[in-house]
Amino acid sequence: MSAEKQKYGVHSEAGKLRKVMVCAPGLAHKRLTPSNCDELLFDDVIWVDQAKRDHFDFVTKMRERGVDVLEMHNLLTDIVQNKEALKWILDRKITPDTVGVGLTNEVRSWLEGLEPRHLAEFLIGGVAGQDLPQSEGADVVKMYNDYLGHSSFILPPLPNTQFTRDTTCWIYGGVTLNPMYWPARRQETLLTTAIYKFHKEFTEADFQVWYGDPDKDHGNATLEGGDVMPIGNGIVLIGMGERTSRQAIGQLAQNLFAKGAVKEVIVAGLPKSRAAMHLDTVFSFCDRDLVTVFPEVVKEIVPFIIRPDESKPYGMDVRRINKSFIEVVGEQLGVQLRVVETGGNSFAAEREQWDDGNNVVAIEPGVVIGYDRNTYTNTLLRKAGIEVITISAGELGRGRGGGHCMTCPIVRDPINY
């Protein structure tokens, strides 16, 4: 008799974190330059060797607290040794639409000949003209390099894989495969989907796919995991702002209600700004009843509640709530939320929010990991009884994401409310 499959799912924002996926800095970050970092959604180039050391420290601190940490390069290295998985990935990544008619066979043949670890690096790190040996389609490659230059990308790098939170999100007993807002990030979802589809870590687990398909054009329906928080009591918070659209929220809510996965969705209508690109950049849970927030943005959030209701069009009742967002979240959980605001005077608070002071990840109730540079906010959290474990922000933070952004929780315990 076969063993029962392990159940995967995330049932709170601050319960004990059991399993998480991360992606260490690597080749993709070595491709960042002052001339291309804006296009690749980084604010600056980074010192990659130091970033790798700092990320290793981050992973080590999670493992020391009992978290099973999966790393994306390692997962891809495993699955590309499976011919079916490799074909599935390359059929989607190496096409006339992505690399051009003249290079499709050449790039694919070269990638198929790489060692698994190197192949995984290039799937995330991208392929530049200079990477291809002249023996592969020599005439075409030479023309490409002569015209566009050796440093131009045949396949663009994916440095934002560092922020594994966004490409997929685990909501109670299932996962979403997110259609990302920016074209620069959409290939990330394809790679993560391949991992879920082919890696034994997931093929031997029990979970559902709630929404999303990397083979489909979702149009204006965009969803990113930094906006999604399953907080318990059958409630999920979803930020609606720069990166996550009402079109995606409506479809996801319908699917979750149809499967009985949640009882309500609280939508946080965010102002559209770079500083508030996701809900988790201004609001995150540190304990069952404590949140850290950037008040300048959170006070502007317009809350809506969506509930299943077959008597209404599309089977949902949608209502705007004339209360503060924090009030609404606390009431629906049945607790009085304690609030720790971004620390310091107005200048310091704006700087610390920009440096991800509110973007902490809870690894168990009352214990979070955050960046060391946010000294005012970290001090206030500690005064409120939160254990703050710090990691270096100098390099990892240049892509505008903290501990919450750099983790994709896969298994997290519920919290009783």
Curated annotation (Swiss-Prot):
Q: Which GO terms describe its biological process?
A: arginine catabolic process to ornithine; arginine deiminase pathway
Q: Does the keyword Hydrolase apply?
A: yes
User: For this UniProt entry, which segments traverse the membrane?
Assistant: none
Where do the catalytic residues lie? 405 (amidino-cysteine intermediate)
Q: In which pathway does it act?
A: Amino-acid degradation; L-arginine degradation via ADI pathway; carbamoyl phosphate from L-arginine: step 1/2
> Any one cellular component term from GO for this entry?
cytoplasm
Compartments in which it is found: Cytoplasm
Instruction: Recite the UniProt keywords alphabetically.
Output: Arginine metabolism, Cytoplasm, Hydrolase
Q: What is its main location?
A: cytoplasm
Entry-linked InterPro entries: Arg_deiminase (IPR003876)
One Pfam family, short name: ADI
Give the matching PANTHER family.
Answer: ARGININE DEIMINASE
Q: Which family does it belong to?
A: Belongs to the arginine deiminase family.
Name this protein carries in UniProt: Arginine deiminase
Organism of derivation: Pseudomonas putida (strain ATCC 47054 / DSM 6125 / CFBP 8728 / NCIMB 11950 / KT2440)
